[in-house]
């Protein structure tokens, strides 16, 4: 199924448990605070920020794990260089798929998006041994990948099919491969983060009708849905559906706890809608009609003024 064949909304997630954490709207202030916090954490002996992220503490390796499991464990949790995972993939072919995927996630975290694309695609194309799959189920469930699903909007995702494909899509987007980035998300189950990523990409590609269909019925329940409503409003505006776009922006502004950055975007977009409506109403034909009306009013005004002067002169004559 291709990206354009989904017949309805794609943001409704019916699962009881999902791999997604709370989304975050990034601002310059937050980025500075996180940078300072990371430096302090490193000075105090915390986990190196360049390593794979983990929710909580790193899982302990079981007793007598075997040479392969120990080597891969160390390459994942005690390493900041994707090359070490690539070396492990070459040394242990049955674990190659897992090693390449983890190397790709590490490269993605470090901002090496072109390399992340190559490693993730290669890892996804290789079948793992049962031992590698068991290792992933035992040790990788708390690995977290922070993915930018739209501009300034990040979501933490636990290790899963969704974390891998969202990271791949983000990396493709960062390397200018927008079509491929959208295609990478096609087979993922419906969810709000995936819907935001897909709609942001579709909007960039000018697929506004798809965005409108995919977001039909969306309400502002959190910042992710507010960000998605902004994308919806912009697509509707480009389609000329200004009334629907206005409703989407009103929904963004309805919830008081909506991120201030998103509220400001909504206010800006609402002003642009008003400007669009003004331009639409002031087309050249309207200007010509209004100009003729103004000229008529000017003639009437002058006639009334002359009549008043004439009446005033008669009153003065009568007084004499």
Where are these regions (language model features)?
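C-terminal non-catalytic interaction modules
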Residues: 4, 271-320
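N-terminal alpha-helical interaction modules that lie
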Residues: 2-87, 93, 98, 121-141
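Helix-turn-helix repeat elements of alpha-solenoid scaffolds
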Residues: 36-51, 72-84, 112-148, 170-180, ...
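Generic helix N-cap/helix-start motif at coil->alpha-helix transitions
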Residues: 22-24, 28-36, 59-70, 93-100, ...
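Alpha-helical junction/boundary sensor with strong preference for TPR arrays
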Residues: 92-93, 127-128, 191-192, 215, ...
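The canonical alpha-helical register within tetratricopeptide repeats
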Residues: 87-91, 122, 129, 183, ...
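Flexible helix-coil transition and linker loops at the boundaries of alpha-helical arrays
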Residues: 57-61, 85-92, 126-161, 185, ...
């Amino acid at each position: 199924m291709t990206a354009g064949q989904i017949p309805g909304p794609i943001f409704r997630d019916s699962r009881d448990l999902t791999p997604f954490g709370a989304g975050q709207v990034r601002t310059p202030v937050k980025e500075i605070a996180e940078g300072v916090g990371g430096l302090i954490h490193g000075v105090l002996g915390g986990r190196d920020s360049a390593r794979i992220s983990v929710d909580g503490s790193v899982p302990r390796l079981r007793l007598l794990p075997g040479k392969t499991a120990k080597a891969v464990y160390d390459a994942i949790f005690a390493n900041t260089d994707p090359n070490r995972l690539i070396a492990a993939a070459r040394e242990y072919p049955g674990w190659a798929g897992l090693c390449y995927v983890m190397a790709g996630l590490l490269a993605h975290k470090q901002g090496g998006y072109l390399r992340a694309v190559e490693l993730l695609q290669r890892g996804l194309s290789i079948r793992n041994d049962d031992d590698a799959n068991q290792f992933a189920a035992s040790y990788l469930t708390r690995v977290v990948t922070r993915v930018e699903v739209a501009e300034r909007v990040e979501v933490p995702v636990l290790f899963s099919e969704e974390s891998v494909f969202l990271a791949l899509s983000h990396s493709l987007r960062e390397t200018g491969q927008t079509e491929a980035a959208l295609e990478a998300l096609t087979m993922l189950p419906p969810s709000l983060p995936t819907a935001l990523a897909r709609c942001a990409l579709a909007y960039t590609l000018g697929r506004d009708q798809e965005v409108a269909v995919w977001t039909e019925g969306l309400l502002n329940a959190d910042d992710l849905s507010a960000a998605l409503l902004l994308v919806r409003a912009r697509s509707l505006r480009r389609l000329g559906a200004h009334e629907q776009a206005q409703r989407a922006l009103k929904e963004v502004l309805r919830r008081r706890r909506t991120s201030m950055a998103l509220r400001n975007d909504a206010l800006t977009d609402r002003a642009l809608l008003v400007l669009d409506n003004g331009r639409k109403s002031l087309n050249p034909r309207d200007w010509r009609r209004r100009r003729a009306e103004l000229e008529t009013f000017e003639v009437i005004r002058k006639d009334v003024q002359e009549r008043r002067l004439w009446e005033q002169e008669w009153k003065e004559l009568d007084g004499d």
